[in-house]
């Protein structure tokens, strides 16, 4: 049984955020707030969502992009993090899995995900 105070706090955290509906295979742009000394700036990270896990305030998602020199870069973001300014869905992907970890081994066009038709 969960503590009612913790549950009330988590519900307040969830209600305050506007999270778009996305799943594995979607291309996302995540804008994060970065603090460097006394300055603050926004950094965008754009890539394919390869997994979502957890529930409630502990829910996370993994974004993978191909960086410079064809090096794969992955970042794990907590969905309800205060440092996330915005999550924007750029494309809806058509996949048949909830976890796309197999994309780590694929290169080039083989790693492309088809776009979901409407």
UniProtKB/Swiss-Prot annotation:
Alphabetical UniProt keywords: Ribonucleoprotein, Ribosomal protein
UniProt keyword Ribonucleoprotein, yes or no: yes
Family matches, as SUPFAM superfamilies: Translation proteins SH3-like domain (SSF50104)
Superkingdom classification of source: Bacteria
Biological process, per Gene Ontology: translation
Pfam families: Ribosomal_L19
One function term, GO molecular function aspect: structural constituent of ribosome
One cellular component (GO) term of this entry: cytosolic large ribosomal subunit
NCBIfam families: rplS_bact
Protein purpose: This protein is located at the 30S-50S ribosomal subunit interface and may play a role in the structure and function of the aminoacyl-tRNA binding site.
Family statement drawn from the similarity comment of this UniProt entry: Belongs to the bacterial ribosomal protein bL19 family.
Database matches in PANTHER family: LARGE RIBOSOMAL SUBUNIT PROTEIN BL19M, RIBOSOMAL PROTEIN L19
Name of this protein: Large ribosomal subunit protein bL19
Species this protein is from: Campylobacter concisus (strain 13826)
